[in-house]
Each structure stands twice: as structure tokens, then as C-alpha cells.
Amino acid sequence: MSMSHLYGTDGEDGVEMENFEVSDWDLQNEFNPHRHRHRQTKEEATYGVWAERDSDEERPSFGGKRSRDYSAPVNFISAGLKKSAAEDVSDEDSDEDEKPVKQEEIPKEFVPKKLKTGGNFKPSQKGFVGGTKSFMDFGSWERHTKGIGQKLLQKMGYVPGRGLGKNAQGIINPIEAKQRKGKGAVGAYGSERTSQSLQDFPVVDSEEEAEEEFQKELSQWRKDPNGGKKKPKYSYKTVEELKAKGRINKQLSTPQKELSQVKVIDMTGREQKVYYSYSQISHKHNIPDDNPQQLLGKDSKPQGFALPELEHNLQLLIDITEQEIIQSDRQLQYERDMVVNLTHEIQKMSEILSHEETAISNLSKVLDMVEECERRMQPSCENPLTLDECAKIFETLQDKYYEEYRMSDRVDLAVAIVYPLMKDYFKNWDPLKDCTYGTEIIAKWKSLLENDQLLSHGGQDLSTDAFHRLMWEIWMPYVRNIVAQWQPRNCGSMVDFLDSWVHIIPVWILDNILDQLIFPKLQKEVENWNPLTDTVPIHSWIHPWLPLMQARLEPLYSPIRNKLANALQKWHPSDSSAKLILQPWKDVFTPGSWEAFMVKNIVPKLGMCLNELIINPHQQHMDAFYWVIDWEGMISVSSLVGLLEKHFFPKWLQVLCSWLSNSPNYEEITKWYLGWKSMFSDQVLAHPSIKDKFNEALDIMNRAVSSSVGGYMQPGARENIAYLTHTERRKDFQYEAMQERREAENMAQRGIGMAASSVPMNFKDLIQTKAEEHNIVFMPVIGKRHEGKQLYTFGRIVIYIDRGVVFVQGEKTWVPTSLQSLIDMAK
């Protein structure tokens, strides 16, 4: 190694100066324990760099005071040709501009060769210089042995040619070793990774990055021996970098609008300056400091060419150019977005334009059709418009031009065209003679003119529904005229007329007809009715209105009952006409009111009739008994049983006892007993009180037979009476068993029906069920509500349901009540 690698010389003065940079020799011998360490001699300590040294051509020895051995062979080190100082300086300058080159990138012919052993090297150094022995033949001794390792691996599942591990994730080839090129430390010659390492672990080694960073920093603190100037380094910014910077920094350099007209006083300089916007401050020149320039030190070099104003202006131009590029990029992006938005707007406007053109075309066609109708509506037209043709035109408008027809004012159009034709169509119409006249044409116009939206919301505004207005202004006057001339007792024609139109006319018009026209006529006729003189029964002209009016007829029932009660004051049960008059009202009146009417007006008359009945076994007159029994279906079973217990059975048992006390014929008594029992229905006989009376008669007969001991007894009388008693008791038992079986079957069917219905029963359904069980009419009142709740009629009582509670209408307020109390009040 030449001394020029350890010491440098000044090109100008020729003074030797020690170069402190790290050389290749230092790196190669970093970890060499036998490296020569220069010991400073006394002369070097005294004179320093001016001490005399051996010739540069002489090679320093590795021993302390060992002299040079000239008998040893000469060893040459491939270190290249020595260049002059100027060439070294130029090379170093050029090297500083270039990036450090890795060891792998240097061609093999330029790499320093290994140092050969011999010469002045010690024996301990020869092994280090020569390198280590190759490991290629390591483990070759196993080829001459039994191969126990390979067999053990195969027993544990190892497959030759595959990696170790459960999933064969191990490496197949053994780890390769790479021999270092020189004597330097680890990493001194670049990366030492093998091709196998790069293949198995392709991650970039952090040591390589650290080496590159070290080389870069090392080149920065090296001192230029000639003091030459380094080449200036320029940093360039591309347009893409400026665009990216502009996208990150969204703050524009231009001032905001509210700050563009702000007056600013600048007092940072020697003089006061006034600016009228913040943007002017950003464009002002930098003012040099007033302080005197600092004196240059010994080591500092004066600037030969320094122009701060020019540098500032250049920097300002650069900044302005950058801002212009950023603003241009933003403007370009804005324009591109604007193009996209305008494209979408054009498409949208094109769709709107086509839609508007279609709408204009459709409106033009609709206008032509309307004008054609107006032309044909003129009196002088040869081909006048008919109602059927007008309906076809409206059907065309509804089918082909539905949107235009829906948006148009159908009320005005119908008033102008349809109403005159409809008046002409019904001008000769008599509703009572031809009740179905015009139903088909009106049903067709209902589908054309009725406003479905108002219908779904329950609206009744005549100004917005053409069909309702048509029926009210054109159809309703004919109905008013005919009802004014109508006689309530001739109800058939009027009922048929309303039945034909009930599904066509609006609900509120039907309510108006029934409440304002029909009901007053019926009420007046009921007031004039006299059941004693009128030959036509009242139910014949009241009951036909029940399907249409239902609960509306409730106010008529009370005066009818009063008139019937007055007519029954002088009635005798022998007159069967009373039953014919009252029987149709049984299902119309509520069960409670009907029972009260019967108990007050009929039952006393029947009791008087039974009191007049004479029971004579030898000559029996049954007319009075038949008159009473004939009312069995009209009065309740309990009322009839009460009459029999009070007015019939005491006399009947008394006659039986008298007959048994006079040596009777038991055969005749048996026939007499069975004959009277056959006069009663099964429902009456099943009553416990009636059973007790007939059983009492059997007991009297048995006692009479048993008490005749020693006297004359009719042969077989005792057996006959016993057989009769047994037979009657068995019939009673069978009847009771049959009743129990029927009740069980009804309960089973009811349970099956309730199980089949998966819909849970609410409180309204419970009330409906109870009403059906007690034969009480339960129905909603049409068009009547209280605080948004639907009103119902439960018999004669008006109720409403709110959160599972029944409220009954009182005199002034609504009173909550229980379900059982409600049923009792309805009865």
C-alpha cells in the first residue's frame, strides 16, 4: 500500500497534509487483529507534519521496529494507477454528483483481487489473506456410511426433494454461504446475500439501506483537498408535483372577496405605507435590514456576486409561476367538472324537452276534441252530440290522455258539455214507473267523472267532484219531485227505485234522500195511522224500508207500540187478528222492548182467559186453552209457564184429586193425564216448573192407588199407574240426556270454529258475539263519529268503543259501562 493513500499533499505549497478520510485499506483491515498500527516516533511527536519520513515507495512493515526484508518476493496490489492531484479533484467532484455504486454493480475486472500470501505477511495473516476453505464438500463423509440420518427423517415423514415441516414449508436446498471478496468488515463490499436468500426472502435488507445512507453522508463531510467549488445542485419541480401540492393545499393565494378592499397600514419599514388590500402586501419587495453587515471572519469568504433583490424577484417569479400552474390546474379541473355537469344537464333538459313536446302534442289533441264537442253542442249543428258519444270521448281522454285528463278541470268540462246532455236525457223520466232508467249510463259516467282521491279521503266537495255535482244538480231534482208526490203506503215502487240506484249514487246523497225525504213522509204517515180502522197493516209499508234505513226507523217504533197498546185495551184472546198484526214486529223490536210490550198488553189478557177455563173430564171445552197456547211463540216461555202455574195447574190438580177420590177408572185417568200432557210443546214440558206439576200429578195417582187397601181396586190399576210413572220418568231422563248431548256438540263445534280462526278476537268482536247470542242488533252508524271514534247502535243504545271501554250516550255526556250492563240496558 503506497503512502499516497495515507497522506495527501497540497498542490500549491507542496506541504504534506494528512488526509483524514476513510480509505479502502482502512475498511479492508477494520477487523484484522494483526493490522499495523503506526506508532508515533519521537521525531514525529516533535516536528509533527514536518517530520522526515521514508520514501513513498517504501512499504511500511507490520512489525514494531522490524526492518524491511528485501529478500522476500515482491507482491503487487491492484490499486489502479495513481493520478495527479488535479485529476483526483476532478474525479472527486464528478463522484460527488454521481450516486454511490454498489459492489455488485462494479465489473469483475475492476474489483481488487485477493492479496497473495508471502512477502512481509506473518504466518497468522496468511490464512486471513487467503480466505477460508470452500464448504462444498462438507458432509461428504456420509456417502460412505449407513445414512442413519436420512433414514430417521424418512421414518418421520420426510419426503426427499421437499421441504421440512408439516406442510413442507421448509427450504429445499441448504443455506448457501457467500465468500467475502476481501478482508473488509461485513458489508464492506456491498450486499452479501446469495441468490437463494433473495429468492426465499425477497425483502429489502435494512443493512443495504443503511449502507447507502452511510455512503451518502460520508461523501458530504469529505474535505476537498484542492478547495475547489462543488457543482451547484438544482432541484426541479415537475408540473405533476405542483398539481399535487395544489390539491393538498386548498387555500388559494388570491385574497377573499371580503378582504380585497381592506385598508392596511404598513409600518414595518422606515416610512409608513398604506395598502388597500392584503394582496398588495404579498407583492411588496423585501427591505434590507438597517443593521450594518457583520464583519467577515477569517475563515469566511466574501461573496463575490450577491444580489438579494434579484434573488427575491426570481423567487417571487417562481412562486407566482407555481401559483399560476396550480390555479390553471384547478381551473382546468373545474372546467372538466363543468363539462360533465353540463352534459348531464343537457341530457336532463333533453328528456324534459321531449316530455314537454309530448305533453304539448297531447294537450293539442285534447283541445281539438273539446272544441269538436263544443261545435257539436251548438243548436245549429247538423250532427248534434249525444250522451253515448260524449261518454266515448271522455273514455278516450281517460285511456289515451290520462295525465292530461287527470290534471284538467273535469268539473268545468263536465258542466259545459255533460250537464246539458244529461238534462235532456232525463227530462221525461218518471222514477217510480221506470226505476232502472239511466242506471247504465250513470254508472259509466261515475267511472269517468268521480274523483278517486276525494272518494278515498271521504270528501264531499261539489266544487271538486264532477260526478257528485252532476247527481246533485241534475239527478236529485227529479227525485225530490217524485218523493213529494209519493204515498208512503205504496212503498214498493220507491223501495225498488232506491234499490236500483243505491250502488250508483254517492253515499251522502242516499243519506240525504232517506233522512230528509223518506223518513219525514213515513213519520207523518205513522202519526196518521189507526190500527183499529186501517185495513192495511202497518208492517206492510214500514218493513220494506228496513234493509235501506235500518236504525233510522227506531224513532217510529215507540209511537207504533203506543198505538198498538191502545188498540189492545179492549182486545180478547179469541180475536186472532192481534197476533197477525203483532207477529211481524217480534224480530223488529228489541227483545227487551218486545217482552215488556207482551207482559203489559198480552199476558194479562191470557191470564183472564185461563181463569175462565173450566176443566171437566167428562165434557171438556178446549177453546180458551187453545187461545192461550197459540201465543206460545209470541210470549217468552217463562211468561207462559208463569200463566200456567198461576191459572191452570191449581184447577187441574184439584180436578184430578176429586176424580181419584170417587172410585175412578184408572184407565180413563191415565188417558186424561196423557191427553193434557200432549197439549204442551216439548219446550214447555222441559221447563222444571212444568215437570214438577206433572210429577206431582203422578205422585197423587200413586198415592191414590196405594191407599186403596181392603177396598175394591180395579184389576191392573196399580201396575198401570206404576208403569206410567216409570215411563214418564224415563222420558224425562232421555230428554235431559239428549239436551246435554246437544249442548256438548254445540260446544265442540264452537271450540273447533274458534281454533280454526287464527285471527285474535278484539273487544269489538266480543261485543258482536254477545249481541248475536242475545239477538241484539249491533251495527255502525253510517257517517257518525264522536271525537274520531265510530258510533255503533247496540239495540236502541248508541255507543262507541275507545281502548277497550264501552261508552254509552247519556243525557248530556258519554258514560263508560260494562258489557253486562250494556246487554241489560239493550234488553
Curated annotation (Swiss-Prot):
For this record, the Gene Ontology CC terms, alphabetical, are: catalytic step 2 spliceosome; chromosome, telomeric region; extracellular matrix; nuclear speck; nucleolus; spliceosomal complex; U2-type post-mRNA release spliceosomal complex
UniProt entry tagged with the keyword Nucleus: yes
Q: Where is the composition biased (Acidic residues)?
A: 88-98
- What are the start and end residues of every segment in region (Disordered)? 31-129, 179-203
> What stretches pass through the bilayer?
none
Q: Could you tell me where this protein is found in the cell?
A: Nucleus
Look up keyword Nucleus and say if it applies.
yes
Q: Which InterPro entries match?
A: G_patch_dom, GCFC_dom, STIP/TFIP11_N, TFP11, TFP11/STIP/Ntr1
Sorted alphabetically, the Gene Ontology BP terms of this entry are: negative regulation of protein-containing complex assembly; spliceosomal complex disassembly
One MF term from GO for this chain? nucleic acid binding
Q: What is its main location?
A: nucleus
Domain (G-patch): residue spans on this chain:
145-191
Sorted alphabetically, the keyword list is:
mRNA processing, mRNA splicing, Nucleus, Spliceosome
Q: Where is the composition biased (Basic and acidic residues)?
A: 41-60, 99-112
What Pfam families is this protein classified in?
Answer: G-patch, GCFC, TIP_N
- Known function: Involved in pre-mRNA splicing, specifically in spliceosome disassembly during late-stage splicing events.
Say which family it is in: Belongs to the TFP11/STIP family.
Its subunit composition reads: Identified in the spliceosome C complex.
Stated name of the protein: Tuftelin-interacting protein 11
